Regions:
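Conserved alpha/beta-hydrolase catalytic His-Asp/Glu region
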Residues: 143, 156-207
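Conserved serine/cysteine hydrolase catalytic core
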Residues: 184-236, 241
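Active-site glycine-rich loops that stabilize anionic/oxyanionic intermediates
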Residues: 41-44, 108
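Gly/Ala-rich beta-loop-alpha elbow adjacent to hydrolase catalytic centers
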Residues: 106, 110, 114
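Active-site loop/oxyanion-hole signature of alpha/beta-hydrolase fold enzymes
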Residues: 15-18, 26, 50-58, 64-105, ...
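Flexible "cap/lid" loop of the alpha/beta hydrolase fold
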Residues: 115-119, 126-156
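Short beta-strand element of the alpha/beta-hydrolase
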Residues: 33-41
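Catalytic histidine-centered segment of alpha/beta-hydrolase-like enzymes
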Residues: 248-257, 261
């Protein structure tokens, strides 16, 4: 495998030909804690994790991030947008970079991918952190809500400042593309909608129930998890740690990176017993 300068974006290719852009951040001077793989949410990109990644590196962790298929600098229109394809991508990253056993930290759709991976590949996963993510469903109105949200973007944005104000955080502006009349999303709208299609018809409680690794569930105080979902998750797996982050909405990693870092650090240093 080709090595790349610290923190620079590199590319690996999955078995179905999808190109994944990733960054491999090693701690200095030497790794003192286990590796972490961070998975972003729908319509996001790996740069969302920058603030948290810096904090985790300071704890001695090797931190790997990547753009999910259809996102960021990865293949824009991949051959598949299925949940299984997203899991295979994460498995490929883990294998190519020799990360196993790894702690998975995933937010929203990235957390869902991490959850499925932990259920299906327990040998690869040391522990699991879900940020505003869970197995609940089916959610038949989800594709329509995502379509409505994407269609509400007032593109072209006339400036990055306007985009930041609308999208809620500067991190969301970093993958916008400049055209002659303004700034546009870099992703394909239909790919985003297709990426959540299975969540409209499927619940993933069996997968959640068979996870055996130590797990932390993080909610934002003003997050968007479905009513009753966290409570059911804790009932089915009572060994799960649960943290509610004050002052955070769905994007906990952007709203409260310090508090999220503290929750993760505490969890990793005193992991709960496997259920």
């Amino acid at each position: 495998m080709t090595t790349h300068p610290e923190g620079q974006t590199a590319i690996l290719t999955t078995p179905d030909g999808t190109r994944l852009a990733y960054r491999d951040h090693h701690p200095a001077p030497a790794e003192a804690a286990g590796p972490l793989l961070l998975l972003h949410g729908l319509a996001g990109h790996q740069g969302e994790w920058d603030a948290l990644a810096r904090r985790l590196r300071s704890d001695g962790h090797r931190v790997v991030t990547y753009d999910a298929r259809g996102h960021g600098a990865s293949t824009r229109v991949p051959a598949s947008t299925s949940r299984a394809a997203h899991v295979r991508d994460a498995v490929t990253v883990i294998g190519e970079l020799s990360l196993a056993p790894v702690t998975l930290i995933g937010q929203s759709l990235g957390g869902h991918t991490a959850m499925l991976l932990a259920a299906d590949h327990p040998d690869l996963v040391r522990s699991l952190v879900l940020v505003e993510a869970g197995p609940g469903g089916p959610n038949p109105d989800l594709p329509g809500r995502i379509a409505g949200w994407l269609d509400s973007w007032p593109t072209p944005f006339t400036s990055l400042e306007q985009a930041r104000d609308f999208l809620g955080h500067e991190a969301w502006t970093r993958t916008l593309r400049k055209r002659g009349d303004g700034w546009y999303a870099s992703f394909d709208r239909d790919v985003m909608i297709d990426s959540v299609a299975e969540l409209a018809t499927t619940a993933y409680w069996p997968q959640w129930s068979r996870i055996t690794c130590p797990t932390l569930l993080v909610q934002g105080e003003n997050g968007t998890m479905r009513p009753g979902e966290p409570e059911r998750m804790l009932t089915l797996r009572p060994g799960t740690h649960h943290r509610l982050i004050p002052g955070a909405a769905h994007d906990v990693h952007l709203d409260q990176p310090d508090r999220l870092h503290q929750a993760i650090r505490t969890f990793l240093r005193t992991p709960p017993a496997s259920p």
